Amino acid sequence: RRWPRSRSRCSPGDPPTMKLPRYRTGDPALDDEVAALVERVATPTDADLVFELVASSLRLARDRADRGDLKIANAALKEMRHAFGVFAPYRAARKVAIFGSARTQPDDPLYLQTTELAAAVAARDWMVVTGGGPGIMEAGIEGAGPDNAFGVSIQLPFETATSQFIAGDPKLMNFRYFFTRKLEFIKESDAFVLLPGGYGTLDEAFELLTLLQTGKAQPAPVVLLDVPGGTYWEHWGAFVDRELELPGYVSPEDHHLMRVTDTVDGAVDEIFGFYSNYHSQRFVEGWLVLRMQQTPDAAGVAALNEEFADIVARDAIEVIDATPAEVADDDHVELARLAFRFDRHGWSRLRMMINRLNGRSEQ
């Protein structure tokens, strides 16, 4: 136990009681002052992290960091703090992020495709996250309705118009930096749909796939959506096959991180099929714990061990109860579980395993 339970707050003038983390300001007297301040506002559970946040700010000052660097750190932290607060009341709601061109016009078939998709996911009590601007972003908000939508906007010298459907809504956030904006998109979303767009859309597509491929984002369905007869993702996929996969820059298994479709039904099937059995995952003491509605029977577990032995670092895939850490956190203890020593490398293969757990064939 790290924190004293006798009290959770410290009054002004009281000596600090918290155990200091290893990361400090470098000045013992200043550390004590920071600790006393932190104990006045932070919960005992999170006091160490709040201490380190303050310590980082003070270390930047002691480093005599350039004012421009301080502005970046300051703005980024303020943007994240605000966004965390906006999303916090909706953490229990599943969300789909929708990316695409700001230049798509309301009479474009892609616009209608997007409104239909957003309406379909909202009808299943999901929310949508878009960039809050015109084009595909506005189509997503219009389809879902503003009550079911977030706007994660970026400040630009052009294409800055806010969608009429979310203007003035408290769920509209404005970001200065792309990196903090993309962090919120990926952190808060449970599924991703990308429609044709420009450099920004392709940037979002490649960064998202990179994060999934390297395990820096939670496994999630990714849909590359076009209209019937459209060639955008077809040509993009041909480029990936020819220029990335053929020379060995990406693996054939990486195709399983995404699905290309030209229908709303196909997109909906991919999103909700991903969560038809699988729920979530968590690492606990070196074990990857997969949570789901129902685990396979003994024969099914044996089949998983045979098919996915290449991503099991040691031991085997097995059915387990909720771990003590999950019980302590009340972390979906009602769900069934599989656990194994994941090699932390084969993330695309892990996605293939999730498909198996959902009873879905490879596409």
Regions found by a protein language model. Name each.
Residues 34-42, 288-301:
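Charged/polar low-complexity intrinsically disordered segments, enriched in acidic residues
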Residues 175-225:
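Active-site/ligand-binding-proximal alpha/beta "capping" segment
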Residues 112-114, 135-196:
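Acidic/glycine-enriched connector segments
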Residues 172-180, 257-267:
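Short acidic-hydrophobic, aromatic-tinged amphipathic segments that line or gate anion-handling sites
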Residues 289-295, 302-363:
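N-terminal accessory interaction module
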Residues 125, 149-160, 195-196, 209-236, ...:
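Short, acidic/small-residue loops that bind anionic groups at enzyme active sites
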Residues 183-194, 243-262:
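Conserved thiamine diphosphate
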Residues 19-154, 331-335, 358, 363:
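Glycine-rich beta-alpha loop segments
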